[in-house]
Amino acid sequence: SNRAKEEYFMRKKKLLSLLLVGTMVAGLITGCGSSSKDTSKSDSGKSKGGKVVLNVINYHVGTDYAADYYKYLFDAFKKTDEGKNVEFNFEEIPTTDAFNQKIKLLISSGDLPDIVLNGGNNITALAAKSGKVQDLTQYLEDDKKWKAMFSDTDLEFNSYKGKVYGIPVSKEISYIYYNKDLFKKAGIEAPETGYATWDEFFAACDKLKAKGITPVSMDSADLGWLSKLWYSGLIGTAGKEGNDFMNKQYPTDYNTSVVEDATATLQKMLQKYTTSDALGGKYDTMATHFFNGEVAMLPNGPWMIPDFKSTDKAPEGFYDKVGIMLLPGSGMESVPTPGDMVGAKDPDKIKAAVAFLKFETSAENQIKALEMAGLQPVSSNIEVPQSLKDSDPLMADVLEVQSKAKYTYGQNQAYWYQNVIDVFSNQLPELAYG
């Protein structure tokens, strides 16, 4: 009925207006960041044994996709000339969400760790305004070989007022993983690179549903990572207007037809095509559904590939059941990543922290990160060994499919105000029940 339609659009508008409110609040909070006092003490960087002790809050622990890689990285650094005099003092926080909340808290009041690992959220400006992270511009200027590892876009993304504060350690891309067996069971032939349109994609979802298969993984807890990737794709592939919107940093007006249409489609996905525990559900649970063959498709990046081989996470042989495709309309999320920052104040600590960032982004370790954690090299001039492509066919597919994307776009966790991101994930259940 017209009345029902009217109410439906009012609910959509409500979600979008809440996003706008979130944006305005974000502006206020970001503005306040510049007045926060620097509470860090200029403590000596050396312990009694003459070692430089670097404090690090590490979320790459436990079952995190990059836990093994970061353990290797910290240990290997201590065996180098620059790191042989360095010790790490770790505080472990096991989820990115809790880590990001902690770092934001320390930016506003407290001491940041000496190395500030990136948690995926774009907090560079917030941290730079606080005066608690080091300007790294001169270190890059003094080491041209190191600077050449990064594109201008990567460094601009990690800059504030023309100064570089973050060193990006990988490139973020995402696309769709699908379960070949479930597609076969539903009588669907997967497209070579992706569905040409969202209509074709939803036709496949309907076929899966008809066979009792849940089409897609979605979530709402911990900022709703999977739901955000679908949402970014819906907007980012909606012609030039949508693509421009998803490639813009810190947009302030969400009352556009492309955002409204994407919101309506996301609502349909939450209501019709996902698991019953998606609302309030965390990423880990939704990933497990995919590993267990309970869901046909999940959007994510290459860092998930090692999990397909891990019998701690997925059944034996699961890797061979997984295929990849671009998002409908030949879309792929591709953004520069927020980089690691230096929160140290003592000169010895700063020197050691910068040396660690150089080690972390060396060509050798970018390949190691790809191999061990599925992290895409940040440097475009790095040659991926054929042996790695041969031993990891899915990763080879990922490296190949990137060139076939017609639309590349950002995702909201990287490009939107933090408060908008928070409001968005909080409103997902209301949108679904709407």
Which role fits each region the language model picked out?
Residues 1-9:
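Short, Lys/Arg-enriched N-terminal segments with co-localized hydrophobic residues
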Residues 119-175, 202, 229-232, 319-323, ...:
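Hinge/lid segment of periplasmic solute-binding proteins
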Residues 79, 84-87, 186-189, 271-272, ...:
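Extracytoplasmic/periplasmic substrate-recognition and gating elements
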Residues 153, 320-325, 370-426, 430:
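Long, aromatic- and glycine/proline-rich binding clefts that accommodate carbohydrate-like moieties
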Residues 27-31:
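C-terminal motif of bacterial Sec signal peptides marking the signal peptidase cleavage site
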